[in-house]
Every structure is written in C-alpha cells, then in structure tokens.
Amino acid sequence: MDIEPEVPVVEKQMLAGNRGKQKTRRSVAKDAIRKPASDSTNGGNWVNVADKIEVHIHFNF
C-alpha cells in the first residue's frame, strides 16, 4: 500500500488593478517530496525529506 502525503498548493491571488508593488519571496525545497526507486513489495513509499516548506508573500500598498 502506497503512502501519499497531502501537499498544500499555494496559489497567487491576482489583485484587481495595479495598487503598488507586489513582492513575492518563495523558499520552497525543490525535492521536498521524492519517491525512491520502486520496491518489489509495495512499489516504494513516499518520503518527506524536507524539514519545512515556507512561502512568504508581502504586499505593499
């Protein structure tokens, strides 16, 4: 039985009009979740190898 973790999806919301600068800084681990080579028994398990995933969004109005 494969174990599939829940991965949050972050979507950038668009503002109506252009009300100043929008600064977005994203610090996301590239390989936060990787699937190792398949195992003959269960097809491999998902392994979370990232300590934390951070997304910082700052708006200046």
From Swiss-Prot:
Region of interest: RNA-binding: 17-35
Keyword Transport belongs to the record: yes
Span list, region Disordered: 15-45
GO biological process, one term: transport of virus in host, cell to cell
Keywords, alphabetical: RNA-binding, Transport, Viral movement protein
MF terms in GO: RNA binding
InterPro entries: Tombusvirus_movement
General function of this protein: Cell-to-cell movement. Displays RNA-binding activity.
SUBUNIT field: Homodimer.
Entry protein name: Double gene block protein 1
Organism: Carnation mottle virus (isolate China/Shanghai)
